[in-house]
Amino acid sequence: YKRQDKDGIVDDYIIYMLNALRQNASEIVAVVNGTLENKSKDKLLSITNNVIERENKGFDVWAYKTAIDQYGWEKLVKFDEMIMMNFTIMGPVYPLNEMFECMDAKDLDFWGVTKFHKYENGDPFGTIKVGYIPEHIQSHFIAVRNSMIKSKQFQNYWNKMGEINDYRDAVGKHEAMFTKRFSEMGFKWDVYADMGEEYNNHPILCATREMIEKKRCPFFKRRSFMQSYDNIISDTFGQSALEAYNYIDQNTDYDVDMIWQNILRLENQADIKKNMQLNYILSSKSSNIDAGIIKARKIALVMHCYFEDLTEYCLHYASMMPESADIYITVPCEKNKEIVEQAFKQLNNNVQVIVIQNRGRDVSALLVATKTVSYTHLRAHET
C-alpha cells in the first residue's frame, strides 16, 4: 500500500481502508514516499509492523518496487495473490469480501477494480510507446495472482524497471501499459466493477454514483472532490462528485467526515467548491429576525479601503450592518484615515480606522491588522 502526504500525516480514511484490507490480507506493507510524523507512523504501525519510509521519488512504481525488493521473489512466490494499491482511492463503502469472493471465482492471472477505456485520439502524455492510451486496469488497485508472480516475465518487469522521473513517465512506462503488456503475453485479466461501454473513458470519476450503486464498486477516487473542473465538465454536467457524495452519505455506512478531514487539509477550496457545487444564493428578502437576537450577537465587519475613491462605496456597504456591529476599516496612510473617519461619522456603530503598511494586500488587513478582533460570533470581510 503506497502513501504520500506533504505534511507526513495519515488521515482516518487511510486507517479505515487498511483495517478493511487487513480482514482479507495475510500481510500488509505500507510504503510511504516521504517521511511521517510520529503520531501518523504509530497509526500505521497499529495496522502493520512493516512500514517503509523512502525518498519521495519514482511515484507509485518505485514504491511498489521497493516493497517487492524487500520481500524478494523467493518469498513472494509463496503468496496466492499480491495487491499493489495506493492512497488515491477512498472506501470501502461495501465489505471487501464481496469483491474478493467474486474475483476468486474467476480464472485470472491478474485483476483490478476499475478500468480506463481505450483512448485512441493520441497520447496526451507523450510517453506511451503505442501512441494512444490502451484499455487498462487502473493502477490504484491491481491484484496479481501466483501464476503471474512466479513468471519470469513479471519478475523481469520489476527487476528491469527503469527510472520514473515524472508523472508522464509513470503513466507511459507502467500505468497505461501494464495491462496491455501482460495481456499480450497471454496472462488473463478482468475488473470487478465494469460499466462496459455505457459510460466514458473514466467511469470511476465521471459515473461514480453509478459505479457504486449499480456495480457495487467499493472504492471512489478522492480526486472526485477537488480535480480540475475543466476535466470533469468535458464529460459530465459537473454533477458526479455531489451525486456520489450524497449516495455514499445516505446509503452506506461510510463516514463522509473522513473525506472532509483529508481534502480540507490538502486541497484548494475553490476546486472543492466547484466539484461539490457549493453555490448558495442569499434571498433578497429580509427575514423576520428578532432584533434582540441580532443585538446579542457580536459582529465585526473588517474592510480594507486602499483607495480614497472607495470611501463612499465602503460607507454604503457598512451602512447595511446592524448598529450593534463593530466596524474596522484599514487604510494605507493617515490622509485616508482622516477621510474615512469623517465619512463614517454618520454611522451609529463603533467605528475604528487602522493605518497599516502597504504589505499583504487585503489579507494582511484581515489577519494582521485586526488579529485582535477575536471576540466576535460572526465576522465579515470586505475588500
At which residue positions do the language-model features occur?
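ER/Golgi luminal nucleotide-sugar-dependent glycosyltransferases, focusing on the catalytic module
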Residues: 2-382
